[in-house]
Amino acid sequence: MRRIKLVVSYDGTAYCGWQLQPNGVTIEEVLNKALSSLLKEDIQVIGASRTDSGVHAMGNVAVFDTESRIPGDKICFALNQRLPDDVRIQASEEVPLTFHPRKANCVKTYEDKILNRKIDMPLQRLYSYFCYFNLDLEKMQKAASYLIGEHDFKSFCAVRTQAEETVRTIYSLDITKVNDLITIRISGSGFLYNMVRIIAGTLVKIGMGVYPPEKMEEILEEKNRAAAGPTIPARGLTLVSLEYEKELAPYLEGENKHWHYVLDQRNVPEKGLAYLTIERCEPEELDGVLRRVIHQAYRNGAKRVFVRDTFGEEGSICGYYRLRRQPETEEGWLEAVYEGEHR
């Protein structure tokens, strides 16, 4: 058995998103059918990002398992002959069977385009959101700066999201304008359901002058979807790329006004041991930080995590932690369990 990775680009206009749907054609369905026809076996792809209806992609990633002996880097050429014109495989390669496109650490980059002029342009209508009101780019850029870093983005996700954890890290958020077209380019560790489109909708409101730029920080603190702006239409949104981590980062750091921690992963590859130092943390956020960061360490290969704090009573949370699976939950949620200070 071999695992093949695909880099997939598509015009999402005619599709009901990525994920299989009972009442509409999806990208996943098209790929499954084309691959099954090409390889003469039942193929089910696993996508990295399950984009919504109307969202486009330049570099989404998918994998599938096959018994075929066709060279991995040649599959893209054969597969493109069987795909519709609005779906193309940009590259294909064989990867380890352990590689999972949704579980591997990566940086996701999206672009959301806004056509900002008095009269709509028909040629842009499927690939941008039209805004009649003049938008103040400087105010939008200032507001965007509040979102950089690790934050709880609960205000910026759809109410019906299934995510139990709403903390994400934004590495960059750039807003540029060329002629009448504004591009919001955002890179992060991952995104909640509708998160990019809600951020874009909030930035539009700030650009219109409905909110001052400083309102963005207040919206973050609210942790309430009703506090943020509207979810703008999907047609202007494109998944640009997913850049996977080639080797484990020696350190992970998370910092905002509520917490600051450093996760040392240098001993994970050889000893399976990570060290988490919590420099400061508000008491009500501590359980969430512990659970989230220890879970990330285990995903990265750690078997145990040693925690120490420098902000509170010495020894209050210090010691070794492991993860315990909760069998009573369908998802098998992993809970951080204190083991004590023994080795």
Across the structure, where does each feature detected by a protein language model lie?
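Short, ordered beta-strand-loop transition motifs
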Residues: 104-106, 175-180, 266-271, 324-332
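C-terminal "cap" of GNAT-fold acetyltransferases
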Residues: 328-343
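A conserved beta-strand-loop-helix scaffold within acyl/acetyltransferase catalytic domains
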Residues: 257, 263-272, 278-279
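Structured-RNA-binding interfaces characteristic of tRNA pseudouridine synthases
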Residues: 1-262
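Acyl-donor binding region in acyl/amide transferases
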Residues: 271-322, 328
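Proline- and acidic/polar-enriched loop/turn elements at helix boundaries
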Residues: 50, 92-94, 309, 327-330
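A short beta-strand motif that forms the metal-chelation/ATP-contact edge
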Residues: 170-174, 319-321, 336
